[in-house]
Amino acid sequence: MSLLTEVETPIRNEWGCRCNGSSDPLTIAANIIGILHLTLWILDRLFFKCIYRRFKYGLKGGPSTEGVPKSMREEYRKEQQSAVDADDGHFVSIELE
């Protein structure tokens, strides 16, 4: 039997909960761990892009360009922009007569 479950028993034609040993330290610790786990999971799902980008790159906004000549940085930026511009032509306009 799990420590985290409550036992439902019929009482006077109604359903009630009977919690045995709710002051048990192990039960309290398990409840706290469960609540923390749920909270962290929700925060992870809400902010996963920000969190993992922060772990990957630290406090910087992106990958380091340290030691890369300025001309190469500019060329890379232009390539990235042209790739984005080229993707705009992916959609085809169809005109019906």
Swiss-Prot record:
GO terms for cellular component: host cell plasma membrane; membrane; virion membrane. InterPro entries: Flu_M2. Residues 59-88 are annotated as: Disordered. Residues 1-22 are virion surface. It is found in: Virion membrane; Host apical cell membrane. The modification Phosphoserine is found at residues 64, 82, 93. Gene3D superfamilies: 6.10.250.1640. A lipid is attached at residue 50 (S-palmitoyl cysteine). GO terms for biological process: protein complex oligomerization; symbiont genome entry into host cell via pore formation in plasma membrane; symbiont-mediated suppression of host autophagy. Glycans are attached at residue 20. One of its GO terms (molecular function) is proton transmembrane transporter activity. Homotetramer; composed of two disulfide-linked dimers held together by non-covalent interactions. May interact with matrix protein 1. Cytoplasmic tail plays an important role in virion assembly and morphogenesis. Belongs to the influenza viruses matrix protein M2 family. This is Matrix protein 2. The gene is M.
